[in-house]
Structures are given as structure tokens and as C-alpha cells.
Amino acid sequence: MKLIVAIVRPERANEVLEALFMAEVRGLTVSRVQGHGGETERVETYRGTTVKMELQDKVRFEIGVSDHFVEPTVRAILDSARTGDVGVGKIFVLPVERVYRIRTGETDQMAVTPGWPEEEPG
């Protein structure tokens, strides 16, 4: 099992969400966050004062998936979030030790994969 964390630009969030649903990825958390990556500095004027904007608005997706869903999930995010510009975002794939579904008490694969136990593809 893995936790996929993707940080994308807010203007690409709807496209990413749609691509994840099309890839049959279910069960995710979306948060508005701020961060700074490889973008150039942005300077704005506010009430006559020049302000250096060091943090950019971003959207964070957190998706717990079984191992066979990692590649389709990452591909959906890459294809929908990529613009070719600097600062588009990052995807992190992290190992997950244990998952519990609070409602049923199911654990691990049964807690993250809809319809489990079905035969895994491939």
C-alpha cells in the first residue's frame, strides 16, 4: 500500500480530480496549501507597498492506494496537471504501514481498495 501525495497548481485541481475519477481512483483528501518550489519570485504592490510573495497557493491531494493502483494514479495526475511550466507541482509516493477503515474496522487492502477482495489485474 502507498500514500500518494500530489501538490499541484490550483488552476489544475479540477482536471486532476476528473482524471482521478476517470482512472477509477476513489477515496482522497484535497486541501488548499501554500508552498514554494522552483517558481521565480512574485512581487506585488499592496496599498502602495511592494510585497514579495514568497509562497504560492497550491492544492494537495492525498490518496491511499493498493500497490496495483499506484501507476494509474500517478499517470492520471501527471497527464492532467502537467503544463510544461516551472512550479507545476510534485508527486510523492510513500509506503503505508497500516490502514484502518473506521466505519467497519477493515484493515489494509480491504480498507483502501473499493470492491476488494477482487483479483488484482495483471
Annotated model-derived regions:
Residues 1-122:
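Positively charged, small/polar-rich N-terminal and surface patches that mediate targeting and assembly
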